[in-house]
């Protein structure tokens, strides 16, 4: 099975991202920061949060569907709010998407919030609500559990451990543990928004998972588009039942301010 994990940055690098996604050949794609704006009349809108302004690909989810016609999609918004075209507000949704090749049966699933709760107003208060998605699949003649989370962003603490992040890790672990059965191959991935020494990873290790990013000696998971000093945010963890054949933190082409994580097993 070939699995891709990526924080897609709201499609900011759309011109590079879409052809790369279309041709990468992943069976399962776990994507964070996916934008879905039903009925949007423009390709690009703006996200505005005080001085922070970022272009967003308005119909990103639909465009992903178009370049992945052989995949089923599950989309789970963490929040909804407004994007902007000049002074015109456009309602939009923002969250997680998982694309699964149609030849791979989805035999179980669970979604839930790991921080806060869904808000349909202004994407929720800071730190924004965050959710996780867990799928149980039948692939390579056996059951797999694939889980993804987009960890909370804390402007004050940066990527340091906080009580909120500890609670988030407990909820993510509970979602995984609630769906996985003994003997399942388990993959947990995402933009966890924490450092390599975080208690988030220690909590997931108690599920029998080990991280391939730090374990593989990679220098980080952020691209040149990200200018802050912390170079780690994204992780991909597996249990002993996952027969890892290849794992890579992909540095080129740049399709986001995060590097894609690629697993073949």
Task: Outline where the language-model segments fall.
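Metal-dependent phosphoester/phosphodiester hydrolase catalytic core
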Residues: 121-122, 129, 138-166
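Short, acidic/polar
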Residues: 11-21
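Active-site environment of divalent metal-dependent phosphoester hydrolases
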Residues: 11-13, 36-39, 81-83, 153-157, ...
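Active-site-proximal beta-strand elements of phosphoester/diester hydrolases
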Residues: 1-10, 108-113, 143-153
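Active-site beta-strand/loop signature of hydrolases that rely on acidic residues for catalysis
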Residues: 3-7, 21-52, 99, 135, ...
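Structured beta-strand-rich core segments of catalytic domains in phosphoester-bond hydrolases
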Residues: 35-143, 248-252
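Metal-dependent phosphoester-hydrolase catalytic domains
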Residues: 177-186, 193-265
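Membrane-proximal envelope and lipid/glycan-remodeling enzymes
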Residues: 4-5, 79, 147, 154-160, ...
């Amino acid at each position: 099975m070939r699995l891709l994990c990526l924080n897609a940055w709201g499609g900011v690098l759309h011109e590079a991202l879409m052809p790369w996604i279309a041709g990468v050949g992943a069976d399962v794609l776990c994507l964070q920061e996916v934008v879905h704006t039903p009925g949007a009349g423009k390709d690009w809108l703006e996200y505005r949060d005080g001085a922070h302004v970022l272009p967003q690909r308005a119909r990103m989810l639909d465009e992903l569907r178009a370049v992945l016609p052989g995949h089923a999609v599950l989309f789970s918004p963490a929040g909804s709010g407004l994007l902007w075209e000049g002074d015109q507000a456009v309602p939009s949704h923002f969250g997680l998407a998982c694309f699964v090749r149609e030849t791979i049966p989805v035999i179980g699933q669970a979604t839930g919030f790991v921080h806060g709760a869904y808000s349909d107003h202004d994407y929720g208060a800071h730190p924004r609500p965050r959710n996780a998605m867990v799928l149980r699949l039948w692939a390579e003649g056996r059951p797999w559990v694939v889980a993804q989370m987009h960890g909370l962003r804390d402007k004050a603490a940066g990527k340091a451990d906080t009580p909120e992040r500890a609670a988030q890790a407990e909820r993510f672990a509970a979602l995984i543990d609630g769906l996985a059965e003994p003997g399942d191959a388990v993959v947990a991935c995402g933009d966890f928004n924490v450092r390599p020494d975080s208690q988030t990873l220690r909590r997931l290790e108690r599920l029998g998972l080990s991280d391939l990013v730090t374990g593989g000696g990679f220098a980080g998971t952020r691209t040149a588009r990200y200018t802050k000093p912390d170079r780690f945010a994204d992780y991909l963890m597996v249990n002993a039942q996952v027969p890892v054949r290849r794992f890579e933190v992909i540095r080129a082409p740049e399709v986001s301010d995060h590097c894609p994580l690629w697993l073949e097993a």
